[in-house]
């Protein structure tokens, strides 16, 4: 037996040597295949887009988002996808750190803490080439994101800067350049491509046209007021309808930019080995949208496509996932170790068609948008209800922000003088109440605050208890204040500290 074993070993060795000698010229290709086995990662975001502005998520405007809809057919659509903080920079930095803003240091529009580990940092160490297109200044400090490709900074006179992250053909051109870099370097890629549509200024407005050296609408189309739908959380009056048409024109232009990115990926030949994640950073910049804690603030049109892994055309309406889960999910997908302090949890099992426990509640936060102004809010959502606590609502402090600077808010203020229903909505938006409760199953637009309805007393108690539990889990510094909210001066003292903190945050107002 021993002799036969030695003979077998010799024969196997000779066969191996022959094989290596005969195919030595192909060894580099074998090495490339092993490297390419690790998937590329493409994160695509849009700026200030409400979830149901997308055809695949319920928008009825014909032809509004054909490219996003096509992506949904190729992957999995999440009907309970959320972001955790409904303002640009904190939302985006949470996605790439797996941490709430109060844990990564970016509560307002300021750089996060230098000791926080980012997703591109970990991918860079694993051999990825990293790139970013659009919203570049919202990843700070810049060195923590390890960008290899950032034409916004490296090509200061380039057409990319002149396009302001809103030109579809530019996304195609610059994405293709990056994909070629990946192929030339023989490195898997990580690209974050961020359309700055449909952020204000909306497409076709005078401010939008003046921000370009050419007409950006030459690559898109302009929707008319009679072609669009006004969401139920806004009054359907002429000025609102006019601005909503401009918003939807921006939504469509964003979709064309996404189409450019996906076209470049397809033509690069790397699409079959690429994980694609699509989402919005927060809801639209209208009253009761962005910079709040409502359904239309935090729900995002989340889509994940991964050829050969995610079953095309699937829909998950059961599990709640959020922005802080993105980094853990990507790390799980590419088999890299997790950060032990992460707030988020991987939802890779869902992408593989499995069920997952502890995916029913989502905790959302809000801190500030403009410098020196803070409106701290917290919310907990389950599959039906949402409970919101507004630390700032004292009956005197008035809400202001990105949503109160446009035509819609001005029109609402004017209409409120004669229309009591609009006046009620305006007044509530400005001053709010400390607590809010909504039945999103029957009232997704948060039109009826149920906090004082005795029929929901038990539900309110459960959600208050859940809020405390989640605040502990996510190390929210507002925990003790919320717990002791009914004690004298607790809220007022907390708000004094918030105002002091606001003086040193929110410096980066290019949101």
Locations of regions flagged by a protein language model:
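Formylglycine-dependent sulfatase
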Residues: 2-4, 20-436, 444-465, 469-472, ...
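Short, charged, surface-exposed hinge/linker loops at domain edges
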Residues: 480-493
């Amino acid at each position: 037996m021993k002799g036969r074993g030695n003979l077998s070993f010799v024969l196997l060795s000779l066969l191996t040597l022959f094989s290596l000698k005969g195919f030595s010229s192909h060894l580099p290709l074998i090495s490339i295949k092993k490297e390419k086995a690790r998937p590329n990662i493409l994160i695509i975001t849009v700026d200030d887009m409400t979830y149901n502005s997308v055809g695949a998520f319920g928008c009825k405007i014909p032809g509004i988002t054909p490219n996003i809809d096509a992506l949904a057919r190729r992957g999995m659509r999440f009907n309970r996808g959320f972001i955790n903080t409904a303002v640009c920079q904190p939302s985006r930095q949470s996605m790439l750190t797996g941490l709430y803003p109060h844990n990564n240091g970016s509560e307002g529009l300021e750089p996060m803490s230098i000791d926080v580990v980012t997703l591109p940092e970990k991918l860079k160490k694993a051999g990825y080439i990293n790139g970013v297109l659009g919203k570049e200044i919202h990843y700070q400090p810049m060195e923590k994101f390890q960008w290899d490709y950032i034409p916004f900074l490296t090509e200061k006179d380039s057409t990319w800067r002149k396009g302001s992250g809103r030109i579809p053909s530019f996304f195609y051109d610059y994405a293709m350049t990056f994909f070629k870099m990946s192929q030339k370097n023989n490195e898997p890629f990580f690209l974050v491509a961020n359309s700055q549509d449909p952020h204000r200024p909306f497409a076709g407005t005078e401010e939008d046209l003046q921000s370009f050296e050419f007409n950006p609408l030459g690559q898109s189309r302009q929707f008319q007021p009679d072609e669009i739908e006004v969401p139920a959380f806004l009054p359907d009056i002429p000025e609102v309808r006019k601005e909503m048409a401009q918003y939807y024109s921006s939504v469509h232009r964003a979709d064309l930019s996404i189409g450019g990115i996906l076209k470049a990926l397809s033509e690069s030949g790397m699409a079959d080995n690429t994980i694609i994640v699509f989402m919005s950073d927060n809801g639209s910049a209208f009253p009761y949208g962005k910079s709040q804690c409502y359904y239309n603030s935090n729900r995002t049109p989340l889509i994940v496509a991964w050829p050969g892994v995610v079953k095309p055309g699937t829909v998950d309406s059961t599990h709640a996932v959020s922005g802080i889960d993105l980094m853990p999910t990507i790390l799980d997908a590419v088999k890299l170790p997790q950060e032990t302090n992460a707030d988020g949890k991987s939802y890779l099992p869902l992408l593989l068609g499995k069920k997952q426990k502890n995916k029913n509640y989502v905790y959302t936060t809000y801190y500030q948008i403009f410098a020196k102004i803070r409106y701290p809010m917290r919310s907990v959502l389950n599959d039906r209800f949402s409970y919101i606590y507004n630390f700032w609502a004292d009956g005197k402090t008035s809400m202001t922000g990105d949503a109160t600077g446009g035509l819609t808010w001005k029109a609402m203020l004017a209409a409120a003088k004669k229309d009591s229903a609009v006046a009620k909505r305006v007044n509530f938006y400005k001053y709010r109440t400390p607590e809010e409760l909504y039945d999103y199953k029957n009232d997704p637009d948060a039109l009826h605050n149920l906090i004082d309805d005795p029929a929901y007393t038990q539900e309110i108690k459960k959600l208050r208890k859940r809020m405390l539990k989640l605040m502990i889990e996510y190390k929210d510094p507002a925990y003790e204040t919320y717990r002791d909210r009914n004690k004298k001066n607790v809220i007022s003292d907390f708000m004094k500290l918030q105002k002091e903190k606001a003086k040193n945050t929110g410096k980066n107002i290019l949101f």
